[in-house]
Amino acid sequence: MRYTDGKVHDITIAYIGGGSRGWAWNLMTDLAKEESISGTVKLYDIDYDAAHDNEIIGNALSMRQDVKGKWLYKACETLEESLKGADFVIISILPGTFDEMESDVHAPEKYGIYQSVGDTVGPGGIVRALRTIPMFVDIANAIKEHCPDAWVINYTNPMTLCVRTLYEIFPQIKAFGCCHEVFGTQKLLSRALQDIEGIENVPREEIKINVLGINHFTWIDNARYKDIDLMYVYKQFVNKYYESGFVSDANNNWMNNSFVSAERVKFDLFLRYGVIAAAGDRHLAEFVPGYWYLKDPETVREWMFGLTTVSWRKEDLKRRLERSKRLKTGEEKFELKETGEEGVRQIKALLGLGDLVTNVNMPNHGQIEGIPYGAVVETNALFSGNKLKPVLSGKLPDNVNSLVLRQVYNQETTLKAALKRDFDLAFSAFVNDPLVTISLKDAKKLFKEMLENTKKYLDGWKIKA
């Protein structure tokens, strides 16, 4: 890398999952709008053609006169080729295909278990983790061999176990996980400020919060805007909208978009515990007993959120594949929209181009009390020149921490089971999940069925009869 006049040149970014039609395009967008950094993005994907398509799309974007950030995109045929010489590594992969995810999400429905996402916890999240962890073992070993000093940014779910695996295999790795769920809660606090106090259009970055918890089950126990206590403002907001829910856009709401909610799960958790649940309702609902919010589709509708079906994801993939073709041929112009992501800002800060405080997922080295040392937790952290320091965030209320700890220990059990290829250990995590409220006999039948549906990613496993 070269530093000149407040800019950094010749940076090398390895992108694992470089054929992505979502996260990769977001990265291209944010790099294109940032003139202070430039270099090469090496795209690796098990689908080389997809990575090559993104090479064409990215290089066409870089040549445009309206683009400030100039990057060379290069598709790589092997993981090793992409990692050699990398200063940063970005991991954004789909572990398996949507066929496996279809089993993760929908096989449990035969037993009355409903999941709104199915990629983090619940039966789907656990089985997804069992096939993801071996992939991250390989990635960690490759990083250790080819670019041990690189900063590693993970976007893949299950976030906690992906990051945890990287550190288990390569303890000296400089890795962290990024998730935008907390950003949505900052935006909700901004809307509460407008609704209750009449203060309009406050950017989420000006909403100062203390974050603590685990990914997708993150909490805020202190929130301020200048001298205004937003915990008090939020309480009034929750009391006002608890029954009706809060809908910010009538044309894009929980009834016509399964990714959107009316925030009623979030509001209910606040009234129960007095701290703000800082993730989308679809994720939060999966961390607590299933009969709270996910008893059945009717209950889900009462709480005003949606069950995201894998059939929808498959249709969406078809649309993105068609868009990829249009972008590749130039039939469609690549629009530089706001992505809402912070990866490029984090890279800049690590390069010494200004400090940044934001939420990330890292091993617990004392930043949260009451959670085991080494478990991956989500808190704020300070990014500065080649340094990342988690912010001391205190302790969750005991009644919240008991919910979090159940998931932490389950995640640790899942990791051990995946590394040992231990059916019984994995099943013990499966039946301990709050969504699995069926009999042991039915739970074992379901578990075996789900493992059978993902067995091509479970090398060395013996699925018991």
From Swiss-Prot:
Co-factor binding comment: Binds 1 Mn(2+) ion per subunit.
Binding site for NAD(+): 11-78
Task of the protein: Alpha-galacturonidase able to catalyze the hydrolysis of the chromogenic substrate p-nitrophenyl-alpha-D-galacturonic acid (pNPalphaGalUA). It is probable that alpha-1,4-di-galacturonate (GalUA(2)) is the naturally occurring substrate.
Domain of life: Bacteria
GO molecular function annotation: galacturan 1,4-alpha-galacturonidase activity; metal ion binding; oxidoreductase activity, acting on the CH-OH group of donors, NAD or NADP as acceptor
Protein name: Alpha-galacturonidase
Cofactor(s) for this UniProt protein: NAD(+); Mn(2+)
